Amino acid sequence: TLKQLIQHTSGVEWNEDYTDPQSHFARLTQCEAQPGAYACVRKIVTGLARQHPAGEQWSYSSGGAWLLGDILERATGMSLAAWLEQALWQPAGMAHDGVWHAYQQGKHDVGAHGFNATLEDWGRFGEFVARDGRLSNGKQLVPTGWFDQAASWTKALNSVSAAHPEGIYGYQWWNNAIPANAQNVQPTPQEGLKGSLWALGIYGQVIMVNRAEHLVIVQWSTWPQAEPSFNAQPLEAALMYSAIARELR
C-alpha cells in the first residue's frame, strides 16, 4: 500500500548501503549518470523481489521513495518540481527557487533524492510543518491530523528498539529523540524533546520540527560519512537541539 511505501515497510528487497558499490542504491545512482536514466531506474525498482510480508519489517528504501515520486507524477500528470511549485512553494511564499534533479526536464524528476533549497526556505518549510500544514494566512494545505499520523511511528520489526521503543520512523520522517537507553548524557532522555519530526539526510542534513514547542532547527553539514552510527552525530544533534529547547523555555 502507499502507507507501507511511505513508512518503508513494503517488505520488498532493497540494499541502501552507501558504501557498497553493488547495493541497490549504488545501481540507482549509476543509472542516473547514464542516458535513459528514468527507464533504467524504473526497471530496477519494479524488478525487485519481496523479502517479507508487507507491513511486518521496516527497512529504509530509496527505491520505495522513488516509486512514491513516480506515483505522484502519474497521478497528477505533472513533474514533481512543477507539482511542488504549485502546491506548496508559491503558496508558502518561499524566498528562492528550489532545484530538483530531473531525468527529463518538466516530465520526470528524481523521486528518491536530489531536491535542493536554501537554508532559509528549508526553515520556512519547517514552519509550515510546525503549523500542522497551514499557511501563514491560515489556509490549510495538508489534511488536518496528517502530521500527528506522521509522528505515529511504525511498530514494524527493526523500527522498535531499546533506544527507540516507540519506533524510529513514520510518514517519511524520523524519530531522533534522545535514545531512551542513553546514559550519562545531558539533557537526559526524560528531559529531551518529545514528538519531534526529523528529516535526516545523508552527510548530516537535518530539519527538526517540534510542533509542541514551535521550534524549527535546520542544520547543514559535511559529515565524513554518509550515514554515521546513531550513537554519534544523530545523538549529538538530539542532545544539542533538546538543550536549545530547554534554554528557550
Regions found by a protein language model. Give the residues of each.
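Active-site Gly/Thr loop motif
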Residues: 95-99, 152-216
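Structured C-terminal helix/loop/strand segments within mature extracytoplasmic catalytic/sensor domains
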Residues: 196-249
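Non-transmembrane alpha-helical segments in soluble domains
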Residues: 3-6, 42, 46, 69-73, ...
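Active-site-proximal alpha-helical segments within enzyme catalytic domains
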Residues: 8, 64-71, 113-135, 145-146, ...
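Short helix- or helix-capping micro-motifs
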Residues: 1-20
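Catalytic-site signature segments of enzymes, centered on catalytic residues
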Residues: 16-113
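Bacterial peptidoglycan biogenesis and beta-lactam-recognition machinery
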Residues: 12, 73-82, 89-97, 117-142
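Active-site rim elements
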Residues: 54-57, 109-114, 194-198, 226-231
